[in-house]
Structures are given as C-alpha cells and as structure tokens.
Amino acid sequence: MQKNKGMLPILIVGAVIIIVGLLWLNQDISSKQAENTGVISKQLVELTDENPTFDFWGKNFPEYLDMYLKVEHETPKYTNFGGNLAYSKLIRYPQLTILWAGYPFSLDANEERGHFWIQVDQMDTARNNKDFLNAHGFAKFGGQPAACMNCHSGWTPWLIKNAANGDFTAFNSTKYWTMIKNVPTRNGIEEGSEEHGGPHGGKRMGVTCADCHNPDDMSLRVVRPALINALVDRGYQKDAAQGIKADRKEMRTLVCAQCHVEYYFKPTGEKVKVMGESIASDSSKKWWNGTQKTYDEFEHWRDGNKATEIEVDGINLTFPWSAWKKGEVFRIEMFDEHYDAVRPIFKEDWTHKETKAPMLKIQHPEYEMFSGGVHAANGVSCADCHMPYIKGAGGKKVTQHNVTSPLFDINSACKTCHTQSEEYLKKQIADIQKSVAFDLRSAEYATVSLIFDIKKLREELGKLPAYQSEGKPDDAKISKALAEPLELHRRGQMRG
C-alpha cells in the first residue's frame, strides 16, 4: 500500500507531461496545417467560379496575390535558355523560320512572359492578326479558334459553361475573337471599358487562382476538359472536386499538365452550331486584301456588330496520349502511335512549304518529357521546383506564387534536396542546359539540311516528264515518289 502511494506523484507528473505533450503536438500539427495559407485577410469574401479573377480571390490571400502580380511590374529577367524577356525566337534561332515554313509560327514566335501575361501576348501576337497573315501568304488561315484560349484565359471554364452552354466542342470551334467578346464584367468594371479589355479581371486576364484551386477549400484541382479527358483515357478516374482522383503530391504536377503539354485540334467529323458575328453579312467590312470579314478583330461588340448563330466544322482540343497508359514513362514513339491512328481524320498541322511533308508542330510537352526524368522518378513535382516553399510573413511557410525559373532562387528551389553549394548547382545546371541546347541545335541544323535536300530533289524530279502534268511539275506525283523521306522529315522534326 505504501509502495502504491509512492507511485502516485510519479503517475500525476507523467499524466501532466502526456497532456502537455498532446497539447503541444496538437498545436504543432495545427501550425503545420496552416503553414501554406500565408497571410489571410480579415475582410473575407466568398470565393466562387462565377468570379474567377485573381483580384477577387486575392482579397482573401493578399500575400499570394502580391507574389503573383510581381511579374507585372518587375523588369523582365533573361536566362540563357528561358526567363521572361519576350525576345523573338525567330531572330535568335533563324533556323525556325525554315523548320516552320508555311506555318504562321514562322512569322512570329516569342519567348513566353509567364502566367500573368499569357492572354495579353496571345491576343497581341501577329499570328492572331488576320490582315498580317493575309499580307504574308497565309490568307487561307482562317484565324485562331477559341480552342487556343484553353491555356491562355482564366475565363475559359466560365465561357464553356455560359457562352458555349456547356458544349466543349462548340467552345473550341468558335472563333477566338468571337469568344473573347463574351467575357463578363466583374469587380465593378464597366462594360467595354479599358479595364474590361485588360489583364486585371478583363478580357486579357491570364491564369488565375481558380485554374488550380477549389474555391471551397483552396485544395488543388484541374478544370480543363482536355486534360481530364486525356487522363481518363489513360486510366485515371474523374473526381467531382479535384477533376481527377490523385493525391496532393501528384496534383502539384497535374495542375501544370493542364497546359504544359503537346496538343492538337482534333476534328469531330461533324458540324456544330457556334456563335458567329453579324459582321459577316456586312459587305462594307473587308480585310485589307478585299476579302469579307467573318469576325471583328476586336475584343468588344461594336458598330452594330452582334452575335449570330452559324454552323462550322467541329474541333476539340485533344492531348495525343491514347498510347500512354497510367503508370508508364512517356516515350516519343507514343506520339507517333497516336498520330498514326488518327491520320485518317487529322493528317497534319500544316504542309511544309518547301518539302510538302505533312507536318506536326510539337508544342510544349514538358509534362510528358518530365515523366521520364530523374526528378519524376524521385517523386518531385513541378511545383517543388518552380513554386518552392519559402518563408512568408511572420516566418510562415508558403508556396512561391511568382512562378519562375528555379535559377532565381536556388536556395529554396534546389537546396532542399541538393546539398551542394549554389555555385556548384548553377554550374551543373549550366553544363546540362548547354549540352541539351547543343544537341537541339545540331538536330535543327541537320533537319534544315534535309529540308534543302528534299527541296532540291523535288526540283530535279519536277524536270522529268514522269513527274509532270501538262508539262509542269506535279506535286502529288513527286510527293508519292518521296513518301519515305517526307515521312522521315515529319517524324524527325517532331523530335528536334
């Protein structure tokens, strides 16, 4: 009995220690859970997809908004192989004008400036200027479709739901300049004002918080139908809240896969009713070359121009992943397999001006190529490097939302895993990038040589009666004879 009494103080002290420990642990867990919220405004608004503007969502998360908008006012930064200085790639890499001969990218292609500017630059590119295209031999190019807005405008989900009545095909098949006229006004912006045409909640608004976050709890989600459709085809399951069933680590890459991918506009083989413009019936409205305007290349309805209903060939933004199954590492041959399978309905992006090869322009398949890299193999996500954790206000851990090159903050982006010095890492990165760039330039120059060889061969064959019709070179006969080298041009340039 005396022995039990002696144990009582010890038990009491032990219980106190356990209780204090549990309280501390609970506080620490709560702190960890709140680490990524940053500074939260006391003037909270109810977030909704009806107002996806970052200025509105930023009312609740001002620290993140400040990070995101930093790129709007800072001096553009150049890196050896990237950055956000919008230089002309055609001037720096003139071989691209030959590789893309016959395609609008041969006229205008600039380094990207980032998520804030992505819609501004898309609307301002010469590839979206019909008079410019007409004047440079691209009169047959009918202008960009709204499908291009999928990865440039934060208004895309709203426009699919409201302007296209939930019809993804109708959205994609509408003209770009027609669809942009339907962007609504929010945050007190006046219809048709300069702000309504601008990047802050207007028609030039780029990527927004809503593109990656659920308004209910700010968890990660994907909202672009093309990615959801492609992932389901690969073996993923749809999810009402996230778009796709995946854990948070994978979602930190999938949100980027909404746009940083290869894609094409797949014909549906059917006509679809879409929004048109009454300007098409106004015989006084012509392009500079005298042809009839079918849309007004302006972001607002004006001068009596109004919406009509027209019928066009349907297209869908599609990711060519049918041969790439869930859990597999991507291989470039998977693109070959997909494009070969759809060739009866989608032959090419364009016919090369010099070789007449049926070409595919590979866009920006970062997600696909990343899947086979050392970082993906070790469980690293896109956000780990391009949106690293940093110390925010009050020393809290937050995600960097000034999405940029890891080179600008190696300490946060790289040294979490890599223990070497910043100087060593910078040199290592530079060596790898230079090696890849050397191989890429070598492949491009070799392809240019092939183009010149095929062009010369076409000219020589065209002199022979067997490859002529009515005494003139017959391109169809020549292309049939050169089917193998033309196919090698197509596939080789896809890889270079």
Pin down the residues of each PLM region:
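Short, Lys/Arg-rich N-terminal segment immediately upstream of the first membrane anchor
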Residues: 1-6
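Primarily the internal scaffold of c-type cytochrome electron-transfer domains
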Residues: 7-14, 23-113, 161-205, 216-384, ...
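Long amphipathic alpha-helical scaffold segments
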Residues: 102, 107-140, 144-146
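A cross-kingdom signal targeting lumenal/periplasmic-facing segments of multi-pass membrane
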Residues: 138-160, 164, 172
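Residues within well-ordered beta-strands of beta-sheet-rich folds
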Residues: 147, 208-211, 258
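Glycine-rich, acidic and aromatic/proline-enriched surface loops and short helix-turn segments
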Residues: 154, 211-215, 352
